[in-house]
Regions:
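Cofactor-/ligand-binding subdomain signature composed of acidic, glycine-rich
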Residues: 1-39
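Glycine-rich phosphate-binding loops that contact phosphosugars or nucleotide phosphates
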Residues: 36-118
Length: 118
C-alpha cells in the first residue's frame, strides 16, 4: 500500500518540531518568561481550521498541567465586528500556519490592546 500524504506529514513532526525549537528558542524563552512573570489567571486561543484543532490540544495540556482555564475566542470579533474584549489578566495565544492570517493578526492586536499578554 502506498504511503499517504497524512502519514508522511505525521512522520515529519519530530523534525519540524526540532526546526521550530532550534529556530525559535529565543522567542519561546521570552514568551515563557513573560508567562511566568504575568501568571495569567486565564488563557484564550485564537485560531481557525486545523490550527483550531491544535488550540484544542493546547487547551487540554494547559488546563491539565498548569491548572489555567483556556477558552477559544472568535477572530471575527475583532476583524469583522471590531469589538474589543476585556482580557486584562489573560494570555492570548494565536495559532496560524502562515502567521499572516488577517483575522488572527487583528485579534492578537486587539487582545494586546485589551490588556492581554499576546
Amino acid at each position: 500500500m502506498a504511503e499517504t500524504f497524512m502519514a508522511r506529514e505525521v512522520a515529519e513532526i519530530p523534525a519540524a518540531a526540532a526546526r521550530f525549537l532550534d529556530g525559535s528558542r529565543g522567542a519561546v524563552e521570552a514568551a515563557a518568561a513573560a508567562l511566568r512573570e504575568r501568571d495569567p489567571g486565564v488563557s484564550v486561543t485564537v485560531a481557525r481550521g486545523s490550527s483550531d484543532h491544535a488550540a484544542t490540544y493546547l487547551k487540554y495540556a494547559v488546563e491539565l498541567l498548569a491548572g489555567v482555564p483556556v477558552a477559544s475566542v472568535g477572530p471575527s470579533v475583532a476583524s469583522i465586528y471590531r469589538r474589543p474584549l476585556r482580557l486584562g489578566n489573560a494570555a492570548c495565544i494565536g495559532i496560524s500556519q502562515s502567521g499572516r492570517s488577517p483575522d488572527i493578526v487583528e485579534m492578537m492586536r486587539s487582545a494586546g490592546e485589551g490588556g492581554a499578554l499576546s
